[in-house]
Amino acid sequence: MTEESTKENLGAPKSPTPVTMEKNPKREVVVTTGPLVSEVQLMAATGGAELSCYRCIIPFAVVVFITGIVVTAVAYSFNSHGSIISIFGLVLLSSGLFLLASSALCWKVRQRNKKVKRRESQTALVVNQRCLFA
């Protein structure tokens, strides 16, 4: 395996590295380059946490939803219908519901994808087993 194919497999950046130019006190321009980060490198650095977005959103959504309930309850207890605080409470309430719904949707999609992958894997195993015993 060549070095270039290894870099492609590891997700090395395919475009040129970004360049930043700085001036130092002697009126010279210093050029520094910084590497680009690919998705594969990001997954390696975070341990694959970027694929668990729905798990991160749930606690935040619950806090926003409860805050929305409290703010809306306080606003309507003072009979301030249509005031800024009641609108803010309703926005928080709807944002919390939206985040919870999107988290549930992401979870469902992920479960469906896992089921499809599992089914494909079982199919490949059965075909391979038939080839071995045929």
Swiss-Prot record:
Gene Ontology cellular component terms for the protein in this record: endoplasmic reticulum; perikaryon; perinuclear region of cytoplasm; plasma membrane
Tissue: Expressed in dorsal root ganglia. Expressed in neurons as well as nerve fiber bundles connecting ganglia and fibers innervating muscle layer of the gastric body, jejunum, and proximal colon. Expressed in arterial endothelial cells and neurons of the central nervous system and peripheral nervous system (at protein level). Expressed strongly in lung, weakly in brain, heart and muscle. Expressed in enteric neurons and vascular tissue in the muscularis propria of the gastrointestinal tract.
Domain of life: Eukaryota
InterPro entries, per database record: TMEM100
Pfam families according to UniProt: TMEM100
Keyword list, A-Z: Cell membrane, Cytoplasm, Developmental protein, Differentiation, Endoplasmic reticulum, Membrane, Phosphoprotein, Transmembrane, Transmembrane helix
Membrane topology, from the record: Multi-pass membrane protein
PTM sites of type Phosphoserine: 15, 121
Traits of the deletion mutant: Mice die at a mid- or late-gestational period. Show embryonic lethality due to impaired differentiation of arterial endothelium and defects of vascular morphogenesis. Conditional knockout in endothelial cells show similar vascular defects to those observed in global null mice. Conditional knockout mice lacking Tmem100 in dorsal root ganglia (DRG) primary sensory neurons, exhibit normal mechanical sensitivity but reduced acute nocifensive behaviors induced by mustard oil, consistent with a reduction in inflammatory mechanical hyperalgesia and TRPA1- but not TRPV1-mediated pain.
Chain positions covered by the region annotation Disordered: 1-23
Location in the cell: Cell membrane; Membrane; Perikaryon; Cytoplasm, Perinuclear region
Primary location class: membrane
A GO biological-process term: epithelial to mesenchymal transition involved in endocardial cushion formation
Residues that span the membrane, as ranges: 56-76, 84-104
Subunit architecture: Interacts (via C-terminus) with TRPA1 and TRPV1. Interacts with TASOR.
Function description: Plays a role during embryonic arterial endothelium differentiation and vascular morphogenesis through the ACVRL1 receptor-dependent signaling pathway upon stimulation by bone morphogenetic proteins, such as GDF2/BMP9 and BMP10. Involved in the regulation of nociception, acting as a modulator of the interaction between TRPA1 and TRPV1, two molecular sensors and mediators of pain signals in dorsal root ganglia (DRG) neurons.
PANTHER family assigned: PHOSPHOINOSITIDE-INTERACTING PROTEIN FAMILY MEMBER (PTHR16100), TRANSMEMBRANE PROTEIN 100 (PTHR16100:SF5)
Protein name: Transmembrane protein 100
Origin species: Mus musculus
